[in-house]
Amino acid sequence: MGRRPWQGVKYMSVIKELLSELALKIKYYNPSDYPHLKDGMKFNIRGTAYIFIDIFNSEKVTQNILLHEIGHVSFGHRHLDCRSSGWDRRQEREADRYMIQHRADEWLAQFDWEPDVIDYDKFIEYFELEKRHYGLVVEVFDEIIGQPQLHSHCL
């Protein structure tokens, strides 16, 4: 497992700061060498918490995974074998929301003023999010801006 430098990614410094505050370290892995690992898996090894990331991910996907996992930690989520699938979905949604909120803040920071319309499809494509996040993206932007936006596909 090797390390990968973060060249030219200014937002990564925010993520690294959050990881440091939460005492989390990143470990990169090659899935062909470690087929049992999955992106974003968190393990404690000798008292240090590691998040495992596939070396073939793009930088944006890696950042999304890290923000999602930081969301789990910041919400105090714990892995319990006996928890219900409803509890699991709730925790995943909270972690996804955390990641999308950070991405929405980053997206809105590019504008000098609040945009009249948010192009959700463009946002999802830019940050390489999965289409399943569309509804949550809409919710997050509606909360941030304080009013429902026209959906970009309605324009």
Could you tell me what each predicted segment is?
Residues 1-155:
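Active-site hotspot residues in diverse enzymes, especially metal/ion-binding acidic/histidine motifs
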